[in-house]
Swiss-Prot record:
Textual note on the cofactor: Binds 2 divalent ions per subunit.
GO cellular component: cytoplasm
Assembly information from the UniProt record: Homotetramer; dimer of dimers.
Signal sequence region: none
This protein's name: S-adenosylmethionine synthase
Pathway field: Amino-acid biosynthesis; S-adenosyl-L-methionine biosynthesis; S-adenosyl-L-methionine from L-methionine: step 1/1
Pfam family, one: S-AdoMet_synt_N
C-alpha cells in the first residue's frame, strides 16, 4: 500500500440493477448445478423497466422452471410492487438461452485419463492483505458492509422508507501501508417519496455509517455525503439498465488489486474466469495468513482446452519475508491450479453461487466460501 496515501473503493447493494442481473444469473446456475453438477452454464441477464431477459449457453440434463425462479429472485431482493418501480410478480421474463458450442465442449470435457482443459484462455488475479481480519483491503470491505447494513435495515422494517437500490463509497487515509482514518464516505439509498432528507441523513449516519465504520477512523475532518443529489426515488431497473458482469471491481478487491477482466456470475466452475479467480484468492489469503507477506497478488493464466496454467506469478510488493520466486515454488507444490484440481480443491461443483453475487465474492467467511479458508497456512509457514 506504500504507493498510496489515500485509496477509495465502492460497493452497490443487492437492489442495484447490475447486481440484480448477477443474482439472477447465479440463481440459474445454482438451480442447474443442484441437479446436474457436471452441467456447463454461461448465463447473462439484462433487467430494465418491466422486464428481465436471460441469454447464454447451457448444456445440462436437468430442467429448471426459469420464469418462476427469476421472478422469485427479483421478489427476494425487494422489487415486489410497482410502487418501488419493479415487480417480480408481473414483469416480463424472456428466455434466450441456447446450447453450449460443441467446439468448446470438446476442449473442456474430460476424456479418459485426461485432465479437464480450461474453459477459455485468460488471466486471473488473486489478492490478500493483512490490513483487515479477513485479509481484504479495508476500503472495499467497509464499502460492502455499508450497503449490506442498508439492506438489513430495509428488510427488517427498521428503515421502512428505504428501497432496494443503494451505493456506497469509502475513502481511507493510509500511513505506513495501514488504514488510519476515513477521509470520506458516500452512501446513497433509494427511498420512498415524502421522506425528508433530514430523516434519511440521521438514519444513515446513526444506524448505518457509525455502527459499521471503526469509530477511531472517524474524525472531525471526515466528509459525509449522504444522498448527495438530494433525492433518490427512481432507482433499480427503472433508473438504469442492469447487466450481468458490470461490477467486476466491486466483486473483487475494489481496485486495489489487478483484474483479468472476466466476470464471475452465471458461469459454472469450468470457466476459469471464475474458478481460477477464487483459487487465486485462496492462494493469496493463505500466503498472507502464513505470514509469508503482508500483501500478496497472484496471477495465473490459461489456454482453452489445456489443463496446466500457462503461467503463475506472485508479487508481494516488497512485503515478502521470503523471495517471491520461492513463494511461486510453494504455490506449485501445495496448490493444484489445473481446472479440475482447483474445482476439487475448493469443492466448487455445488449450488453456492447466488450468495456470492452481492456484497463481494471475497472477504466473507461463509461456510460455502471454501476459498476463504486458511487451511494451508501452517504448511506454508514452515518455509519461513
Amino acid at each position: 500500500m506504500s504507493e498510496y496515501s489515500i485509496f477509495t473503493s465502492e460497493s452497490v447493494s443487492e437492489g442495484h440493477p447490475d447486481k440484480m442481473a448477477d443474482q439472477i444469473s447465479d440463481a440459474v446456475l445454482d438451480a442447474i448445478l443442484k441437479d446436474d453438477k457436471h452441467a456447463r452454464v454461461a448465463v447473462e441477464t439484462l433487467v430494465k423497466t418491466g422486464m428481465a431477459i436471460v441469454a447464454g449457453e447451457v448444456r445440462t440434463s436437468t430442467y429448471v422452471d426459469l420464469e418462476d425462479l427469476i421472478r422469485q429472485v427479483i421478489l427476494d431482493i425487494g422489487y415486489n410492487s410497482s410502487d418501488v418501480g419493479f415487480d417480480g410478480a408481473s414483469c416480463a421474463v424472456i428466455n434466450a438461452i441456447g446450447k453450449q458450442s460443441a467446439d468448446i465442449a470438446m476442449g473442456v470435457d474430460e476424456a479418459e485419463n485426461k485432465d479437464m482443459g480450461a474453459g477459455d484462455q485468460g488471466l486471473m488475479f488473486g489478492y490478500a492483505t493483512n490490513e483487515t481480519d479477513v485479509l481484504m483491503p479495508a476500503p472495499i470491505y467497509y464499502s460492502h458492509r455499508l450497503v449490506e447494513k442498508q439492506a438489513e435495515l430495509r428488510k427488517s422494517g427498521a428503515h421502512a422508507w428505504s428501497r432496494p437500490d443503494a451505493k456506497s463509497q469509502v475513502t481511507l487515509r493510509y500511513e505506513n501501508g495501514k488504514p488510519v482514518a476515513v477521509d470520506a464516505v458516500v452512501l446513497s439509498t433509494q427511498h420512498a417519496p415524502g421522506v425528508s432528507q433530514a430523516q434519511i441523513h440521521e438514519a444513515v449516519m446513526e444506524e448505518i455509517i457509525k455502527p459499521v465504520l471503526p469509530a477511531e477512523w472517524l474524525h472531525s475532518n471526515t466528509k459525509y455525503h449522504i444522498n448527495p443529489t438530494g433525492q433518490f426515488i427512481i432507482g433499480g431497473p427503472v433508473g438504469d439498465c442492469g447487466l450481468t458482469g458490470r461490477k467486476i471491481i466491486v466483486d473483487t478487491y475494489g481496485g486495489m488489486a489487478r483484474h483479468g477482466g472476466g466476470a464471475f456470475s452465471g458461469k459454472d466452475p469450468s470457466k476459469v474466469d471464475r474458478s481460477a479467480a477464487y483459487a487465486g484468492r485462496y492462494v493469496a489469503k493463505n500466503i498472507v495468513a502464513a505470514g509469508l507477506a503482508d500483501r500478496c497478488e497472484i496471477q495465473v493464466s490459461y489456454a482453452i482446452g489445456v489443463a496446466e496454467p500457462t503461467s503463475i506469478s506472485v508479487n508481494t510488493f516488497g512485503t515478502g519475508k521470503i523471495d517471491d520466486g520461492k513463494i511461486v515454488e510453494l504455490v506449485k507444490e501445495h496448490f493444484d491450479l489445473r481446472p479440475r484440481g482447483l474445482i476439487e480443491m475448493l469443492d466448487l461443483m455445488r449450488p453456492i453461487y447466488r450468495k456470492t453475487a452481492a456484497y463481494g465474492h471475497f472477504g466473507r467467511e461463509l461456510p460455502e466460501f471454501t476459498w476463504e479458508i486458511t487451511d494451508k497456512a501452517d504448511v506454508l509457514k514452515a518455509a519461513l
